[in-house]
Amino acid sequence: MPVIAAKILVGFVVGVLIGMTGVGGGVLMLPVLIFGLGYSPIVAVGSDALFQFFTKIPAGLLHLKNGTVRRKVVLALALGSIPGSFAGVKLLIYIRLLYGNGVNTFIKLAVGVLLIVIPTMLLLQKNIEERIANRAPTMKGFAGMAVIGLTVGFIVGLTSVGSGSIIMMLLLLFYSFPPKINVGTDVVHAVVLFGVTGWLQFRAGNVDPRLVVALLIGSIPGGLLGSHLATRVPMLWLRRMLCVLLLITGARMLWPA
């Protein structure tokens, strides 16, 4: 199969899985780029960040139109996540300057940890939602949201992973927003965060523009198909199987054979 066709196919398959399960693009895309297409982890991270920026724009606009976005929350998160992302990308540049290709080992370890943590969170999400339903928020104000943004921005700057899963879980735990508002607010914030992160990664030379274009060509129809199939397949079991696969992938990154 020609290389360009393989990249488009990867974008299509990941788009279908995202559309069907709602599992974030970073945790699905990065392992395929690294293990499947053979990209260095640092280029995979940078390219994935820019890819996610473009893929989240349509959903963000739709949520704004539907009124499912807390704009003040987006602002508070962004006040933390933008400097956090800047710090994360700068740390990658610094590690590469000191250790050369050792930065790729560092990224694999960081992504491996996230591929253990995030699927575990997703598997437990339903139980957590049921336990805290109708509970009063345990945190209030911009400061707490900005800290959440700072933490997630730093992680995304390092790995391009975790924007959706981690922010949604933290908003759920500490602010008790309705799920629909959580999703809309997270998606619009992700547009801002990945826009900044993608630009920083591009400036650092960590983006393969041709890869990003090929992935987008495949992911757009893939996402539409996945959304169409979401009501026609046993999504709960598919999501669980996907989480188990991600856990195995994370273990492989942490403990390679």
Describe the predicted segments one by one.
Residues 1-10, 35, 65-152, 203-257:
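Juxtamembrane transmembrane-helix boundary motif
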